[in-house]
Regions:
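Generic structural signal for well-ordered, non-membrane alpha-helical segments
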Residues: 14, 18-22, 36, 40, ...
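Structural signal for hydrophobic packing residues in well-ordered secondary-structure cores
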Residues: 29-33, 51, 114, 157-163, ...
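Flexible glycine/proline-rich
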Residues: 19-22, 36-41, 50, 63, ...
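Short, glycine/charged-enriched hinge/interface segments at domain edges or termini
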Residues: 2-19, 69-232, 237, 377, ...
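Intrinsically disordered, low-complexity, positively charged segments
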Residues: 11-73, 77-81
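Helix-rich terminal scaffold detector
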Residues: 1-18, 180-313, 317-323, 334
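Solvent-exposed alpha-helices and their adjacent loops that cap or buttress functional pockets
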Residues: 62-64, 76-79, 97-101, 114-116, ...
């Protein structure tokens, strides 16, 4: 499983900025071993294990980008129309060794290979046909409406770098260069638990002081979106020995174990102690809100080579979501061999005033709407408690307030990250 040292998550500062957290993950966590070859149709969501090199050029040959007439640019008059003899006809896919001679045009269709010697194509809408001749206007640039072999990707170039998380466009490129299979990293195996004496299975018997488990479903869905194989290990009660036993057993066969709840300093918060008893634990007080301290560690199973990374998230579902996308996701990507992701929050106008503490990154749940002038603006959800799940279902994404910002006024611009951006 994951090759982690006891102190890989150790950090001595007071509040760890997010950028430092990302750097620590890059420096101290190594991707898991294990590569498998998958057919292209099953490759979406997987991570390329090596650079994928183009065995052929894309496109493989010079071809026409339009339906029209292929010509030799050197034949064209700079002063007015040029009359050319239509000497042939080339459909897409037609094998031909047609070569164009001076004074000729070849009728050509989109995707057809350019005749040898032709370098420019007129669109059929722009020419005048008269029997076997065609009159083409002046002013078209050499190379117009033509696509050149390798202009998309030369043969031998890197089509997809190692660590690419394959999505539809990457699979399409691999297919376009003729590949049928790709070497990808094996899927990560992740175990999840919920903790808490008050937490019960949805659909199960619920006594008056119990709540249905939301976090395991949140975590399973987030992890599966990122391509992990999830083992759902259920709900653990707030019992130190039971927790330690369950966590120890879970390390076997898993790269990562994620729990929610029980990590703060209440009397029923035993996750810290349980992890310390069976492995090593550090607390990352990350400079992020929402998201109280996140427990990071390594847990060891019965046999010596069975170890897994551990992340203990807070219990409140919104805090679970934010700490997952900002802390667990970078760790998961690193373990999976994926390149680090750079998020680009898009500036949107805020419709509200907001104050925050300096030196921490803050995330605010917002909906987007059109302002009276038609510009997009962000509206804060009226409830900002970390336990308010509808504040996630009724909004579009998170505004990201940078560390150095302390207040914004209506009309200011703040970076917006959609839930889709955050979860991918
Ligand atoms: P804790 O960190 O264990 O004190 O939990 C903080 C809050 O999150 C408490 O109100 C818990 O009831 C709630 N909570 C913990 N686990 C879950 C869960 N799996 N689903 C929904 N809410 C939870
Ligand atoms: Mg609890």
């Amino acid at each position: 499983m994951a090759q982690l040292t006891d102190d890989c998550f150790a950090f001595s500062g007071p509040l760890l900025p997010l950028t430092d957290m990302e750097r620590l993950i890059g420096e101290r966590v190594a991707p898991v071993d294990g590569v498998e070859r998958v057919p292209l149709r099953l490759a979406r969501g997987r991570v390329t294990a090596d650079d994928v090199i183009a065995p052929v050029a894309l496109p493989p040959f010079d071809n026409s980008a339009v339906d029209g007439y292929a010509v030799r640019h050197a034949d064209l008059s700079a002063e007015g129309d040029t009359k050319l003899a239509v000497a042939g006809r080339l459909m897409a896919g037609a094998q031909s060794d047609v070569a164009i001679r001076p004074g000729e045009a070849i009728r050509i269709f989109t995707g057809a290979a350019m005749p040898a010697g032709a370098d420019t194509v007129f669109m059929q809408e722009d020419v005048t046909v008269d029997g076997d001749t065609v009159a083409v206007p002046k002013g078209l640039k050499r190379g117009a409406n033509s696509r050149f072999a390798g202009e998309d990707l030369p043969a031998g170039n890197v089509a997809l770098p190692a660590g690419t998380v394959l999505d539809a466009q990457h699979v399409a490129l691999a297919a376009a260069i003729g590949l049928t299979e790709l070497d990808v990293r094996r899927r990560l195996r992740v175990a999840i638990f919920s903790t808490g004496d008050e937490v019960v299975e949805p659909g199960g018997l619920r006594h008056g002081a119990a709540i249905y488990d939301a976090n395991r479903f949140l975590l399973a869905a987030l992890l599966e979106r990122l391509g992990a194989e999830v083992t759902d290990l259920g709900i653990l009660s707030d019992d130190p020995d039971g927790l330690a036993r369950a966590l120890k057993n879970s390390s076997a066969g898993h790269d990562l174990v994620v729990t929610s709840g029980g990590v703060s300093t209440g009397e029923a918060d035993h996750v810290r102690g349980a992890v310390e008893a069976i492995g090593s634990l550090v607390f990352w007080r990350i400079a992020i809100k929402p998201g109280r301290p996140v427990a990071m560690g390594v847990i060891r199973g019965a046999s010596h080579n069975e170890s897994a990374a551990f992340v203990g998230l807070p219990g409140n579902p919104v805090a679970v979501f934010v700490t997952f996308v900002r802390v667990v996701k970078p760790l998961l990507r690193r373990l999976s061999g994926a390149l680090p992701q750079t998020l680009h929050p898009l500036p949107v106008r805020v419709a509200f005033a907001y104050k925050k503490k300096k030196d921490r990154r803050e995330y605010v749940r917002v909906s987007l709407r059109r302002g009276v002038d038609g510009e997009l603006e962000a509206v804060k959800h009226p409830q900002d408690g970390a336990g308010i799940l509808t504040s996630l279902t009724e909004t579009d994404g998170l505004l990201e307030f940078a560390e150095d910002v302390t207040s914004v006024a209506p009309g200011d611009r703040v970076g917006f990250l959609s839930y889709a951006d955050l979860m991918n």
